């Protein structure tokens, strides 16, 4: 399965194992070096922000607003398993865990109910460890190398929430 990195304005993002916790909203160790979020979920968050009256109906949600430092096109939680590798032209990342809802997420979106909506929707994104350091640029196409496929991101997300 192939996927594409999402919109990014600026130079290529450098990724290395020493970057543990480069996510702006969810710091962590080496297993959380990169937080990736599916672009497909952005319309949902734009709609619920408008419903919560923290944004206008036509107000776009800027890329990176969900705390991610990598936006994925054509790939979401249903297709990510712990240990899968995302192979890009210049680096390799390994799926490590789902993001759990936290107050920082609600603050980033401008309304506290966002935390519950993440839990309910399962639109959590995923953290990645760096296997081979390198850089990522907008529009790069990558592929998934399947891992053991024992635990999916959505299933682990639900289990950690006790659902």
For the regions a language model picked out, list residue spans one by one.
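Active-site glycine-rich loop that binds ribose-phosphate moieties when present
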Residues: 109-116, 120-130
């Amino acid at each position: 399965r192939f996927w594409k990195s999402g919109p990014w304005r600026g130079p290529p993002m450098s990724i290395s194992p020493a970057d543990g916790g480069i996510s702006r909203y969810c710091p962590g160790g080496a297993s959380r070096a990169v937080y990736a979020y599916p672009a497909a979920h952005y319309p949902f968050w734009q709609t619920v922000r408008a419903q919560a009256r923290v944004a206008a109906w036509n107000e776009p949600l800027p890329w990176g607003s969900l705390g991610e430092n990598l936006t994925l096109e054509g790939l979401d939680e249903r297709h990510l398993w712990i240990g899968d590798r995302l192979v890009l032209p210049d680096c390799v990342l390994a799926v490590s865990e789902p993001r759990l809802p936290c107050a920082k997420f609600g603050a980033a979106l401008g309304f506290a109910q966002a935390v519950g909506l993440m839990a309910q929707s399962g639109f959590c994104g995923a953290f990645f460890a760096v296997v081979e350091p390198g850089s990522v640029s907008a529009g790069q196409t990558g592929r998934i190398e399947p891992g053991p496929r024992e635990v999916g991101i959505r299933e682990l997300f639900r289990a950690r929430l006790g659902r």
